[in-house]
Amino acid sequence: MSEKEYVVIVKADVDLEAFDAEVAADTGSGQIPNRAVTVANPRIGSKRMTHWMLTDEEAETLAQDERVVAVEIPPDQRTDMEIGLHARQTSVFERQSGNNSTWVNWGLRRCTETTNIFADATTLTGDYLYALDGTGVDFIVQDSGIQADHPEFQDAAGTTRVQQIDWFAGSGIVGETQDSNFYTDYDGHGTHCAGISVGKTFGWAKNARIYAQKLGGLEGTADPNTGISITNAFDCIRLWHNNKSGADANRPTVVNMSWGYGFSTTSDPTSGTYRGTAWTYGVDYTTRAALETATGVSIKRLNSATTTRLSTRNATVDAEIEDMISAGIHVVIAAGNNYNKVEASGGADYDNNVVFGSTVNYHRGSSPYSSNAYMVASLDSTTQDDGGTEKDKTSIFSSRGPGCNIWAPGSNIMSACCTPYNTSKYSPIAYFGNGSFYQMSISGTSMAAPQVAGLLCLHLESDPTLTPAQLKSKIIADSKDVVYNTGVNNDYDQISTSTFGQDAKILYTRYASANALSITKE
């Protein structure tokens, strides 16, 4: 049987060096192959992973070792799952949509209030008050790239804050080359997300230092494959963060990840298991609507109702996130736009599965995932009447549930766009400050996550010594429990109102000063 590259992920308390020595030895016992196994990638930036050349049988056996979390094909090489961005053009969602050069990210205004000050209105003209601007903090957008010369990313002197570093040189990884077009965003998604976090008009951290990491698979259709592979991307960030020295030694790092993995199909399922009970499609449930109402397997909604996209997890990517957080990096992740419930480990829906040829645990959310990161669900730009009070509610597309931990505005969010941009996805307008650049309003949990990432930069400016755990505890404690909630955790067909059991906590900041910004929500 031929060998192929596998990622071996060990548990957090396992001595990886000692484990690897066993795998590389000429002889092995137990689940360790009885031969000297060749290293495919030593992963010098990881404390939990090494890539080995194994046969399928050896990989299956090694996965049974009590020290191992998982043995799987590297995410870049998998064909049973796909990487994607968590945003869609606003007009898809049948809400008030469009573009206007006077509009500003309404999340800035909403998250400085303890309750919904918009009521049921779509427009609010007032002041966004702020005292902090992210000075002294390093922000990374891991996405489709960034337009480095966009005016949104300039400092007060008109100089770009985007640091166009070579990630391999900065991390010390040898044998890899960063493409000359790495700092061109051919899509627009990454530029938009960065604008929400650190834009000087649309963003929270208006003076944070900006870094961009274009991720392979997210580059956009016009991009000539200039991104960094998943495997290298996480190592680059960890090692670069650990290598900070001199005046930069104590600068905190915040990473926004508005992307995730999913499984797409145009077929009907054959069977599955819901809360421990097996079912067969066509017998127990004869329509997709009945199946969704009973089990939460989403009906076909995407691409003119022909494609179902389910969230999927990848142990390799999730372990990468844990390693980043352990290194002191603050990680923010978009929950996804798959309409799905994201159950917490051990919850009633965590082991639900559906068979579409392969078996998918569809209520675990999508990778990247970590309960120690900020898993961000999206608030809508419309509200829900609750006994005469207009309450914030979930965006219809948003994945949400006990496996997520905070809500932030994600529908109809105005921010920067790049040139060139993805014409098949976006319809930007001229940037209000310079007609040679673009801005646009789009929706997604992709837009909710960078609201959180931007606010983290403000907290870290105030106290750069905060660990990821300390700051997460503070952010969650400060959040306001005001999202409309049906009170039911399995009303899966109520996708426009139900939180699916997620805490109703909205991102909130108490920072304020006399500095004012006129703002309009549309």
Set out the residue ranges of the language-model regions.
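Substrate-binding/access-modulating region of protease and related hydrolase catalytic domains
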Residues: 216-370, 433-450
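Inhibitory N-terminal propeptides of secreted protease zymogens
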Residues: 1-85
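Hydrolase catalytic cores
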Residues: 1, 194-197, 211-218, 253, ...
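Subtilisin-like serine protease catalytic core
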Residues: 99-104, 124-232, 245-254, 263-269, ...
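Extracellular S/T/G-rich loop segment that most often corresponds to the catalytic His/Ser-adjacent loop
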Residues: 143, 329, 355-461
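Structured segments of extracytoplasmic/periplasmic soluble domains
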Residues: 22, 26, 65, 74, ...
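Protease zymogen maturation seam
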Residues: 32-41, 64-137, 151-152, 502-504, ...
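Active-site-proximal beta-strand/loop segments in catalytic clefts of secreted hydrolases
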Residues: 10-12, 73-76, 141-145, 196-200, ...
